[in-house]
Amino acid sequence: MEAKSGNGRTLLGAAGARLRRRWDVAVVIVIALLLFAPRFSGPIDLRYDAGVYYLLGTSLAKGEGYRIPSEPGSPQALQYPPLLPAFVALHQVVLRTTDPAIVAPWLRTSYIAMFAFFAVAILTLARKFLRPAAAVAATALSLLHVMTFFMSDLLFAELPFALAAVGFALVANKEPLKSRLWPRELAAYALAAASFLLRTAGLALFVAWVFDALIRRRWRLALVRAAMAFVVVALWQGYVERVRTSNEYLHPAYEYQRAPYQFYNVSYAENVALTDPFRPELGRASIKKLVGRLATNLCSMPAAVGEALSTKDGYWREALRRFEETFRRLPPGGSDFIPIIPENIVLVPIYAFGMLVVAGLIAFVRRGNWLIPIIVLGSLGLICTTPWPGQFSRYLTSVAPFLTISGMLGWSRCSSVLRAQDLIGAALRARQLGWFARLLQWGLAGLLALTFAIQVRTVFRVFRVRQNDPPAFASALEGREGRHFFYHDAPWRDWEEAVAWLGANTSPDAIISTTSPHFLYLRTGRRAILPPMESNAATARRLLEAVPVSHVVVDEMGFLDVSRRYALPAVQDDPATWQVVHSVKGVRIYERTPISR
């Protein structure tokens, strides 16, 4: 009995020792699971670009090629690389159905597992450069960011891209024996290629991979890496060019199907060549405008990076207002609120984090590690070329792990240089400025504590709003019971209810114009397209009728107002032909008459 008792204590002691050694892994897994706990069940969110990814996967699963089946003529796709659609197709093939009511919940399960792996991968990478506590902090900053868990709720490429990018950095940062060089190179290549085939922004990983070898003067290795990267990039760009020069592309199913503003149906290069893709009447961007765009985006990047490490500017301002209301004992959300604390004070922690990232990148370079700095700078450079500053927070989600690790490295380095034993700290104390060094140390600690407090508050707020917002209007996608999603407010619910009416009251061959065409197709089976973005109402109406569009949905969506700005004037100017046949609060459905049913 004593021997058994001793063995039991030994096993418990060993388990306790392992737990103490791996407490950091346990912490980040718990954070990841807690972030998914309120949303374990139900389908993955298929709004926005997610609907396109799902439909492309359906086309692949059915053996119909890489096409968008929701569009008239099912045109070939060339905007999105094919790896995420292939991932969707794999689920559909295994489940033997393309029905989103069955497949979407399984996709959510896959994203839960992916999110857990993502958390552990960030921690593993962070531990290469940081102490365990700082590595956990870097991982938590990334996981608790509102955009990270929002992107994990959508069938978007951001989460798998970020996982592949972190995996690439883990593999490429290893220094194995020469005999293991090529297995490592092949693994790094596979992960970089996967990143590129998820989002073309993965080009930054290839660039970093090649430059890493050049900086280390491994000329032959750099040449081999460049050749390997060229193969993947050339294959995708060759496919894009083949589609663009095809007869089908040059003679589309309807006149504006391949217009440059049709961002789902054209290449990135063609879309970003516009001055503003959502205001195509401004025309193509000249060299001067492109340079101006780059300069403007570069100026806004420090704040965007600071927000990517903490939270979005709006949540900082909201927390500041709530603090002031509580301190002054004012009712929350009062319309007559006059702030005493300047709102722009929130820019101090935001820019401070941006500076910490710079300090961290410098620390990487001083250590001789160029890979992560080049990934970060290359990714930021690509983002700066885009005309969508409102999308920066989404794009930065994919590189957020590198930003948080760099930021925490900068934080750790700044904290250490202020200590008494460090040269700078000792110099300050020698000049009787030790109080200033301690003040800066407390400031750094306070910055981190404040950021975590704001992030946790934002998590609770966003989840509370998710629960209080109206659930999705029941359809085949959600089943009998509507589900809750992030940022699914009343305009979305009204749109879904209006779309349900269309599904019940239109013929199967109807073509509908709406701001969310792919999601409409998934919910109703009706072909759907974006409205023509033409400032001339008569031109827009002619294009709609030439498709021919049978119904136009004018919504109140906040994320995209093209139906109100372009489609509404077109149908309102011809009340004899276009009449309102149904409305749900602010959502109106116009029908072209006469329509044979």
Predicted regions and their residues:
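Start-transfer (signal-anchor) and selected internal transmembrane alpha helices
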Residues: 1-37, 218, 222-228, 351-352, ...
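Transmembrane-helix signature of polytopic, membrane-embedded enzymes
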Residues: 24-29, 101-104, 122-144, 162-163, ...
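Signature aromatic-anchored transmembrane alpha helix within multi-pass, membrane-resident enzymes
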Residues: 24-30, 190, 206-207, 211, ...
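Transmembrane alpha-helix segments characteristic
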Residues: 31, 142, 187-192, 346-385, ...
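Multi-pass, polyprenyl lipid-linked donor-dependent membrane glycosyltransferases
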Residues: 48, 106-114, 137-167, 172, ...
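Loop-to-helix entry region of an early transmembrane alpha helix in multi-pass inner-membrane enzymes
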Residues: 82-86, 96-120, 151, 155, ...
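Hydrophobic, aromatic-rich transmembrane alpha-helices
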Residues: 122, 301-368, 407-410, 415
